[in-house]
A protein has these predicted regions:
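N-terminal accessory regions of nucleic-acid-interacting proteins
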Residues: 1-81
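Short amphipathic alpha-helical segments
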Residues: 98-99, 149-151, 232
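Conserved DEDDh/DEDDy metal-dependent 3′-5′ exonuclease domain
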Residues: 103-106, 112-190
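Active-site catalytic pocket residues across diverse enzymes, especially alpha/beta-hydrolases
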Residues: 25, 153, 234
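Conserved RNase H-like, two-metal-ion catalytic cores of nucleic-acid enzymes
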Residues: 66-135
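Acidic active-site catalytic centers that drive phospho-/nucleotidyl reactions
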Residues: 88-90, 145, 163, 223
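Acidic, Mg2+-coordinating catalytic module of metal-dependent nucleases/exonucleases
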Residues: 183-249
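Short phosphate-engaging motifs
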Residues: 28, 122, 144-145, 223-226
Length: 249
């Protein structure tokens, strides 16, 4: 589902109305026919479409983020795929006021970068990684990764954000990232380690074991890279469930 297939950002248009439009063959803004929904709702939709096209042409993801229901932000991905930043952090614990961020890995446009505490992980290097990103993708990042980075480094991550934990729940998948990857058939290059292992590896690195850092970084990079595979799998499943099912009715 692309943004221009979506009518749900319009105030007063819910799932039922959007699916009614789709099932009547109106699957794109350019195909809109107000007779399917009645004059009042048709006026709202036509006004929204006229307003929305310039925002889409300008690559303004924030406009659609503000108008989409929170559970539908996954629809942003197809339009903003090249400017999507997948990222994951490792820390010394769970308290973003007391514990430290140890590594942060970013996956953008096929390239993966890792920043390490004490080497190149600073507020400036973080800001550069997020620069020009139109969409963030994480797993449990709204409750964990984002608060940690904002508290620890003072970076502003107030931008469109798909936290994959929520669309996974929408599809009936619960649990942690690794268990959901397993259920969906998303494979990893490296053996799986736990969050506790990540803390232990950092402690070993601080005591002088460079190989422990190599293992931690490899694990962290896998997390970031696999977020793209998970995003695309989730998007495909939701596209089928939400869009194709309605079109077939």
């Amino acid at each position: 589902v692309r943004i221009e297939n979506s009518f749900i950002p319009v105030q007063g248009v819910g799932e039922a109305t959007e699916q009614k439009l789709w099932s009547n063959g109106i699957t794109h803004w350019d195909e809109f026919d107000g007779s399917v929904v009645g004059p009042t709702r048709a006026d709202r939709i036509e006004t929204f479409i006229a307003d929305a096209w310039p925002h889409l042409d300008d690559g303004d993801a924030s406009f659609f983020d503000r108008n989409l229901p929170s559970g539908e932000r996954w629809r942003l991905y197809e339009n903003f795929r090249p400017e999507t930043c997948f990222f994951d952090i490792e820390t010394t614990g769970l308290d973003h006021h007391r514990d430290r961020v140890t590594t942060v890995s970013f996956h953008r446009d096929g390239e993966t970068t890792t920043l390490v505490q004490g080497e190149d992980l600073t507020a400036d290097t973080l800001a550069r990684q997020f620069e020009d990103a139109k969409l963030l993708v994480t797993f449990n990042g709204k409750r964990f990764d984002v608060p940690f980075l904002e508290t620890s480094f003072g970076v502003d991550l107030d931008m469109p954000h798909v936290d994959l934990m929520y669309p996974c729940k929408q599809l009936g998948y619960s649990g942690g990232l690794k268990s959901i990857e397993g259920e969906l058939g998303v494979e990893r290059d490296e053996p799986d380690i736990t969050g506790k292992d990540a803390v232990r590896l950092w402690r070993e690195y601080e005591r002088g074991d460079e190989s422990a850092l190599d293992t931690l970084v490899s694990y962290n990079r896998d997390d970031a890279v696999n977020l793209q595979s998970l995003m695309e799998t989730v998007q495909d499943k939701l596209h089928q469930d939400v869009f194709e099912t309605a079109r077939e009715q």
